[in-house]
């Protein structure tokens, strides 16, 4: 750790705040000349109905900035930085950030490197940034501001400094991890995984019933399901009106309890004790009205929870799954990786169902990445062909 510690000692927290369009243009031009830029962001999902990106922290090796999108509004100068394939964008745990940057600014990320993904492919078990920095550099991140309201203005200086610190460490961490991946011939694996990750997008409801994303809804009968949907729509309306996150209006447990007990009067609702006194006072009447509407809806209009009919797995496919799983686990153990990193169980099922007979057949499987096909494609084909040979005897 000595060399890594010296690398960290040379780092200094020297950043500036960018809160005007003109300054953002200058910053973007500066980043355009860099080979890599570290990126992190802070959002306000715990304080508002529609979450927003409230800060974007970006750092090259000689420029570190905290960008205020709420003040600037138009972040178009950054588009060329994020979309430039010659500039590597370094994230840690990029999934949420990629979705958020696309949702709020329609940014596409080209040439991304996720240090958390890199950690997984190096066999590191604890991949949170705090754990990785502590293990690598002996640094502990102060997380006391992690759940604060990042939309408040002005932000206290200590919160801005907290935000600036995370990206400070991503460049040296990325350099070390990429060197280790290269030594193990796994850098191309992570690059392909990161390319796939850079294309994730926010989930869209598309007018679908809200109960489809509600845990436990599939266990309800149609009448209870109608009540739950009415309650979810009511909560969503209140949350949007008050600009609060859904969980700060009424929690999921309370809604499920009301849907099952279906109180048709204020007294019934109060007796159920599903709500706090404050919630009952503010939302009780609206909840009872929602319940009553669902209770009086005609049977023909009641929702049906969609059931995905899956064909029973044949004995042949089950044997292939078992054989492939065993081979993948052995390979993962030899590489000191989690088997799910090497080949997720769902992908094993896809391969077993397709039953590819040669490497060319493997190329027809869209979920199988190039690095997987090159690394253990021959083993997959060998396992499956061996099973065929045994079945013919």
Model segments located where?
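Accessory DNA-binding and partner-docking regions appended to nucleic-acid-acting proteins
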Residues: 157, 167, 173-393
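Active-site-proximal helix-loop-helix substrate-binding element of RNase H-like nuclease domains
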Residues: 10, 17, 57, 62-171, ...
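Short beta-turn/strand-loop junction motif enriched in small, turn-promoting residues
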Residues: 42-46, 274-276
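N-terminal accessory regions of nucleic-acid-interacting proteins
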Residues: 1-37, 41
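Flexible glycine-rich surface loops and low-complexity tracts that mediate binding to linear polymers
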Residues: 41, 92-93, 362
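A short, glycine/Asx- and small/polar-enriched loop/turn
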Residues: 50-52, 355
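Non-catalytic, usually N-terminal nucleic-acid engagement modules in DNA/RNA processing proteins
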Residues: 38, 47, 54-58
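Helix N-cap/beta->alpha junction signal
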Residues: 20, 93-94, 251, 344
């Amino acid at each position: 750790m000595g060399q890594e510690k010296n690398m960290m000692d040379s780092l200094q927290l020297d950043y500036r705040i960018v809160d005007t369009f003109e300054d953002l243009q200058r910053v973007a031009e500066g980043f355009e000349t860099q080979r890599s830029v570290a990126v992190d962001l802070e959002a306000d999902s715990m304080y508002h109905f529609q979450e927003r990106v409230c800060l974007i922290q970006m750092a090259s090796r000689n420029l570190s900035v905290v960008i205020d999108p709420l003040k600037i509004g138009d972040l178009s100068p950054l588009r060329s930085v994020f979309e430039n394939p010659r500039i590597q964008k370094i994230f840690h745990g990029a999934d949420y950030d990629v979705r958020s940057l696309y949702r709020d600014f329609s940014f596409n990320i080209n040439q991304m490197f996720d240090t958390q993904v890199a950690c997984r492919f190096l066999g590191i078990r604890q991949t949170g940034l705090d754990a990785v920095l502590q293990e690598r550099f002996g640094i502990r991140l102060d997380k006391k501001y992690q759940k604060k309201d990042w939309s408040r203005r002005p932000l206290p200086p200590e919160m801005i400094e907290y935000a600036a610190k995370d990206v400070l460490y991503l460049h040296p961490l990325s350099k070390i991890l990429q060197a280790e991946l290269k030594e193990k011939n796994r850098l191309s694996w992570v690059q392909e995984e990161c390319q796939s990750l850079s294309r994730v997008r926010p989930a869209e409801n598309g007018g679908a019933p809200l109960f489809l994303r509600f845990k436990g809804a599939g266990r309800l009968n149609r009448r209870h399901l109608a009540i739950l949907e009415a309650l979810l729509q009511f909560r969503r309306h209140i949350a949007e009106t008050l600009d609060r996150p859904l969980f700060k209006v009424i929690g999921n447990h309370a809604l499920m309890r009301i849907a099952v007990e279906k109180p048709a009067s204020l007294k019934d609702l109060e007796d159920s004790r599903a709500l706090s006194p404050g919630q009952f006072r503010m939302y009780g009447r609206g909840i009872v009205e929602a319940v009553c509407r669902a209770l009086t809806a005609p049977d023909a209009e009641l929702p049906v929870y969609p059931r995905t009919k899956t064909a029973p797995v044949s004995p042949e496919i089950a044997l292939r799954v078992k054989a492939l799983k065993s081979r993948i686990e052995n390979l993962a153990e030899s590489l000191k990786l989690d088997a799910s990193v090497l080949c997720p169980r769902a992908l094993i099922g896809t391969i077993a169902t397709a039953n590819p007979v040669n490497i060319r057949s493997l190329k027809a499987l869209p979920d199988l990445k190039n690095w997987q096909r090159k690394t253990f494609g021959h083993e997959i084909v060998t396992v499956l062909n061996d099973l065929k040979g045994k079945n013919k005897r």
